[in-house]
């Protein structure tokens, strides 16, 4: 039986999750909550400037959208506790508004009748933060109801750090994410609490903050406090890159040794037999650029030619589609919860 899913917030991630999940026999999307009307939601689902036209049929009704003949209820509730998830038999809510990222607010979905909530961002005081391929085995269905899927950057970074830590032992490190602009920035100069994000996104390199590196400690506890990082938002709408430099305890003998560890890890994930692990890490030796990874479902695309080694100082780089790759992990996390009996 398919797991029933509701989506709260039908923005970039909400719609990408819908696309990634639609047609999968394990998942049935039954409802969407968003303050925008159904007509607009249907249009934005069908036509996407980055990911193209939706391959199925999409039409709007007064309080629903119809996709490939299946009607999906649309609500416009500001208070998550008022969304009738329970009446629809919803098992999991994808909390994708970017607003309800703390325990108090996310738990309102449980009041509405949902069994589990997955927050599509780093969260304040969730029951657990899960990064597939890194710490999913820590999930306990009986104890964990409010789950953070971390950020797109952490989902790229964590598998890479895991490989390095297991192979060489990470002493400390620093990450820079070269990140596509997002809706949290301004199209043209306009006030923002972050003065740099107030500047026009499509014509500037915008230095800003990221919690992705610090969040590693939540999924790899022995590295808590050992990593930090920063972000550079750049003028592309999708497709990002992490640049990671670490000091390791055991110096690798060569660049080739580092790359071989990633090649082996990518193969291990791919051949794991677990549907939710197949697309964690991809090994690439081609001289690619950001456009080449848009639409790539992997959490991290390791760029082997960019690896550098100086004694016990190791530098690696990995690409990620910050929308599609992350949304595919959301989909796979739902599947994983179902496999664990919710």
From Swiss-Prot:
It is found in: Cytoplasm. CDD domains: GAPDH_I_C, GAPDH_I_N. The record marks 179 as: Activates thiol group during catalysis. The active site is at 152 (nucleophile). D-glyceraldehyde 3-phosphate binds at residues 151-153, 182, 197, 210-211, 233. PROSITE patterns: GAPDH (PS00071). One of its GO terms (cellular component) is cytoplasm. The keyword NAD applies. Keywords: Cytoplasm, Glycolysis, NAD, Nucleotide-binding, Oxidoreductase. SUPFAM superfamilies: Glyceraldehyde-3-phosphate dehydrogenase-like, C-terminal domain (SSF55347), NAD(P)-binding Rossmann-fold domains (SSF51735). It is an enzyme of class 1 (oxidoreductase). Pfam families: Gp_dh_C, Gp_dh_N. GO terms for molecular function: glyceraldehyde-3-phosphate dehydrogenase (NAD+) (phosphorylating) activity; NAD binding; NADP binding. It catalyses: D-glyceraldehyde 3-phosphate + phosphate + NAD(+) = (2R)-3-phospho-glyceroyl phosphate + NADH + H(+). Catalyzes the oxidative phosphorylation of glyceraldehyde 3-phosphate (G3P) to 1,3-bisphosphoglycerate (BPG) using the cofactor NAD. The first reaction step involves the formation of a hemiacetal intermediate between G3P and a cysteine residue, and this hemiacetal intermediate is then oxidized to a thioester, with concomitant reduction of NAD to NADH. The reduced NADH is then exchanged with the second NAD, and the thioester is attacked by a nucleophilic inorganic phosphate to produce BPG. Homotetramer. Belongs to the glyceraldehyde-3-phosphate dehydrogenase family. NCBIfam families: GAPDH-I. This is Glyceraldehyde-3-phosphate dehydrogenase. The lineage of its organism: Bacteria, Pseudomonadati, Aquificota, Aquificia, Aquificales. The gene is gap.
